[in-house]
Amino acid sequence: MLVKDFITKELPVLKSFDTGEYALALMDDFKLKHLPLLSENIYRCLVSEKDLLAMPDPTAIIGDPVLFSPSVQEDTHIYEALALVTRYQLSLLPVVSTEGEYRGVITRDKLIDILSELCNADTAGSVFVLEVMPQDYSMTDIARLIE
């Protein structure tokens, strides 16, 4: 399961000439805490709501800051994307080509949906948890218990 299969391009991006006020409004409209900043379709950084609120003048343009820029390439496995989103508490993760060209994003919500599907969380059934000491572990005993 690769990231390229779950990319969305429906979310807005920021440009260096956008204002902090505009970026905050976009984040509020789309219920996001982060938005990617692009320059000529090249991913530059991930702008957070926290960074924008810390701006002395929210009506000033964002410019081309060198900030935090996490991203994954299109051929990255979904687990690596999940690890980054979890580690940095991101609302979305930009996806780029090998040349750094912006391809879209994968959202935290989409990653949770994928994880749920992988774990069969929405399927009816049961989960058995067996606590066994390592020296007592025997696959035949476990199979007999399950039968």
Where do the language-model regions lie?
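Short amphipathic alpha-helix segments
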Residues: 135-147
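N-terminal, positively charged regions that mediate nucleic acid binding
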Residues: 27-33
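Extended, non-globular alpha-helical segments
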Residues: 53-55
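Short hydrophobic beta-strand motif reused across regulatory alpha/beta modules
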Residues: 33, 45-50, 91, 103-111
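Bateman/CBS regulatory modules and CBS-like beta-alpha motifs in cytosolic regions of diverse proteins
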Residues: 1-26, 37-38, 43-46, 57-84, ...
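Long, contiguous binding/interaction regions
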Residues: 113-119, 124
